[in-house]
């Protein structure tokens, strides 16, 4: 029996077969590309951490440079702290995540061994406005944080405020917000405050009893990742 190619049945069968074939091909391609995608994600993360450490990797292999400098990872619950040895000095790198004006923002904050002085920062964003909020990734904004302290005079973790020029934070060190990008700048300020609070257990080890996360922090033990 000859199949009528103009019939509804033929159209349905043809469409179903094509959908199945395309779905299978997409699944195969996705599986084939998955390892490369994961490798790219890891490399981007390593580059961002090196950026927070102010390491120029343009003339070398960033993955190899990262492996030499970042020699440990500490885990506090679901939070990770990367430990680097930079010219014989210990640096702690904390991942950051928050919200900007149009989407997510994030980055990495590098602290000196005193867990107080900011060594460097590296920010990223999903969709902030070019020339305005997107400037959080640029050096003039990032360099303001270098040398700032996240603790107040009493040793409590209070973060660093991002404020419009002329405004002053009470009991906090501060940097200037980006002109014309109030919401993104506020997002960076909130991101730092919230994320540092989430790292209270790590930050307050060896720094007295001050804590931003409540009275149960002492029950959380740091765990080193297995190599």
Task: Please describe what each predicted stretch is.
Residues 2-227:
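Flexible, solvent-exposed loop/hinge segments and secondary-structure transition points
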